[in-house]
Structure formats: C-alpha cells, structure tokens
Amino acid sequence: MGSVDASEKTITGWAARDATGHLSPYTYNLRRTGAEDVVLKVLYCGICHTDLHQTKNHLGASKYPMVPGHEVVGEVVEVGPEVSKYSVGDVVGVGVIVGCCRDCRPCKANVEQYCNKKIWSYNDVYTDGKPTQGGFAGSMVVDQKFVVKIPAGLAPEQAAPLLCAGVTVYSPLKHFGLMTPGLRGGILGLGGVGHMGVKVAKSMGHHVTVISSSDKKRAEAMDDLGADDYLVSSDEAQMAAAMDSLDYIIDTVPVKHPLEPYLALLKMDGKLVLMGVIGEPLSFVSPMVMLGRKTITGSFIGSIEETEEVLRFCVDKGLTSQIEVVKMDYLNQALERLERNDVRYRFVVDVAGSNIDDTAA
C-alpha cells in the first residue's frame, strides 16, 4: 500500500452546483481507502452526452454538487491490502459504474451493469453513505472489481472514450450475435458513440451504413470513418430504396425521434438497438415489428469483462477514437459545443495536465 491515506486527502474537481450545468472548481475529501480499493491519479477523462443530461438535470434525479465524468483513465498511486489485480504505477480505466450488489442474477452472470443496485460513478451514493464523484477531478478511489487495465499499445487519452462509447457499441454486437463478417449494419447518429460504432462494425467485417438527418456528414462518414453507405433519413426516396436492407441498426440518438422509418430499413428478424438516454416515450405501430418479426431492444454500456475485451479488440485492430483534447478550464465550453453537436467526435479532458489544484476556490 502507498504511504498516503486517501481518507485524509482533500482534492479538487469541477462540479455543477445546480441545473444550469455550469462547472467550477470544488474541493472535497476522497472516501476512505478500503481493503480492495484502488486509488488513482486521474490522467484523462472523456466527456459523454450523459454528462450533459446529469449536470442539467434532464432526467430529474441530479444531486448537487456533482463532479461528472465516467470515462476515466488514471495511474494507480495506492492500493488496499487485498488488491490483487493492480499495482502502483499501472495505467487503468474506470467507467460508468463503481459498485453492484454482487448477488443478483445479472451480477452472477457478470453483466453487473444491469444490477438494480448498481452504483454510478457519480451522482449516486456509495456504500458508506457519501456521494460518488466522477473523473473531472484529481483523484478517485474505486473498488478493484470496477477497474480495468489499459493495455499496452493504447494511449491513455485514446482509451478514455472506449470505457463508455466503445463498449456501448461492442456489447450489443457481441450479445445479440452480430459479430459475423458480412452482416449489413446501420449506425443512426454520428456522434461519440456512433463514430465508434462505425469503426467497430467495420473491423468486424460488416457493411456499414451511416444514417443521418442531412447530407452534411457524408464526407466524414465515408472518407474519414470508412462507412460503406450514407443514408439521409429526411430523403423519402433514399429511405424507400433502402427498405429491408439491414440486419441491425445501432440507434445512438439521445433525443426523442420516430422509430418507424428505421424499422422499415430492417430485414426480417432485424434488430433496432436503442442506446440513447431519452426521457420521453417513443412510439411505433405494432405491425412494423410483427410483419417482419423484427425486434426493438436496448443495450446499456457493457460489463467489466466486455470493457476489457473492447480495449484488447481496439489494440488488435488498430482502432482509435477521434478526439479533441482540452484542458479543465475549457470544460464548460466543451459541454456547450457538445450540446450543439460541435465536436468530432469526443472531447477528452487532460486532467493531469490542467493543474486543477491551483484553481481551487
């Protein structure tokens, strides 16, 4: 174990204080280091669309002050006496959840992200009764079960988006048996998750169609990301010509939208996989699924096991996420740009390089 007791350490993070979502420096104490805990110095943290939802209370359950960030890469600086998986100096990652009951069916099946008692990386309450705070901060304390090793060959800033966006697209492709080469897949929405969907699906040997509401992303989808086709959803002729052509659609859109136009694109037995966090009901008429034995389903991030898999997959395939690295003092501007879809394709905050302790008020 390292010589610093994390329970005595006061750190600085950037927190939202209310539903305006504005972040500013905030000091707080790390929780006491448990026997199986890992203390990490945060190096980088990705910015996810969920951070917008949470900081602005779009889902109605936000608690303040809130330090967001759940795509966290850091260096281990201390370990509890029963930690066996990690050592001081390891570069590791932490994703969306930091706790679960370990006793329910999902936990026993190693899909702990579906545990009804899971503990979120931030905006939640830990087992000690204290609020969890995320990766827009100097340090974190996390149970070793919810920590993954960043493999050699993957830069830490590149690894950050894979801990949420990367595993979010990998998990349903694996679970629903959609990893077979030659499948025809659609990626609806070309943001942080969608761009990884294109890359992962292409690396599995799929024919990939990007679906977007306008033609403005065609060049980046096909020339930069390597998509095979581009479909403008507002063009009725294009949509009609593409009916019954796709084995699956990964729907990453995080706002309310119609489902029926996309169900029509699926072949018989095709799957529409919902991934966007949407706080309003979505609707469709039942014949749209009945007459093709189609499935509307959902998938939520991925397990710790799948996170480790997608990190190795990206190293093996030479995949990287397309990121814009920013400093901590750019956080609010980055969130504003994310809200208006002005990023290609993921912001990653250089936490360690931001000297955040100097900004504490």
Swiss-Prot record:
It catalyses: (E)-cinnamyl alcohol + NADP(+) = (E)-cinnamaldehyde + NADPH + H(+); (E)-coniferol + NADP(+) = (E)-coniferaldehyde + NADPH + H(+); (E)-sinapyl alcohol + NADP(+) = (E)-sinapaldehyde + NADPH + H(+); (E)-4-coumaroyl alcohol + NADP(+) = (E)-4-coumaraldehyde + NADPH + H(+). One of its GO terms (biological process) is lignin biosynthetic process. Its cofactor is Zn(2+). Zn(2+) 2 binds at C101, C104, C107, C115. One of its GO terms (molecular function) is coniferyl-alcohol dehydrogenase activity. NADP(+) binds at residues 50, 168, 189-194, 212-217, 252, 276, 299-301. Pathway: Aromatic compound metabolism; phenylpropanoid biosynthesis. It is an enzyme of class 1 (oxidoreductase). Keywords: Lignin biosynthesis, Metal-binding, NADP, Oxidoreductase, Zinc. Zn(2+) 1 binds at C48, H70, E71, C164. It comes from the Eukaryota. Binds 2 Zn(2+) ions per subunit. Its EC number is 1.1.1.195. The keyword rRNA processing does not apply. SMART domains: PKS_ER. Belongs to the zinc-containing alcohol dehydrogenase family. Involved in lignin biosynthesis. Catalyzes the final step specific for the production of lignin monomers. Catalyzes the NADPH-dependent reduction of coniferaldehyde, 5-hydroxyconiferaldehyde, sinapaldehyde, 4-coumaraldehyde and caffeyl aldehyde to their respective alcohols. Homodimer. This is Probable cinnamyl alcohol dehydrogenase.
